[in-house]
C-alpha cells in the first residue's frame, strides 16, 4: 500500500460515502489500474470505477526563500453494491 497516502474526509467525500464511493490521496506517479488493484487486494472489495484528479502543490515561504509542496492525486473509488470498507464507514444513528 505504498501508493495510497491516506483517506480524505471533506464535505464532498463524506457525501460520496452514501453513494459507496471512497476518497483517497495517492502518490502522483501511480496509475488508476495500480490503485484499483491495491484497494481490491488490501480491503477485499470489488472496485467498479476509479476517478482521479491532480491537486496542485501549495506555496511555502521560509524567510526569503520561496518553495512549494509537491502536488498529489486524489482518487475517488466506486465500489460494487454490497461491498464497503468498514474502517471508513461513517456511523449513522
From Swiss-Prot:
MF (Gene Ontology): rRNA binding; structural constituent of ribosome
Subunit relationships: Part of the 50S ribosomal subunit.
GO cellular component: chloroplast; ribonucleoprotein complex; ribosome
Name of a matching Pfam family: Ribosomal_L23
Lineage: Eukaryota, Viridiplantae, Streptophyta, Embryophyta, Tracheophyta
Keywords of the record: Chloroplast, Plastid, Ribonucleoprotein, Ribosomal protein, RNA-binding, rRNA-binding
Record function comment: Binds to 23S rRNA.
This protein's name: Large ribosomal subunit protein uL23cz/uL23cy
Stored InterPro entries: Nucleotide-bd_a/b_plait_sf (IPR012677), Ribosomal_uL23-like (IPR013025), Ribosomal_uL23/eL15/eS24_sf (IPR012678), Ribosomal_uL23_CS (IPR001014)
UniProt entry tagged with the keyword Ribonucleoprotein: yes
Gene Ontology biological-process annotations: translation
Species, as recorded: Saccharum officinarum (Sugarcane)
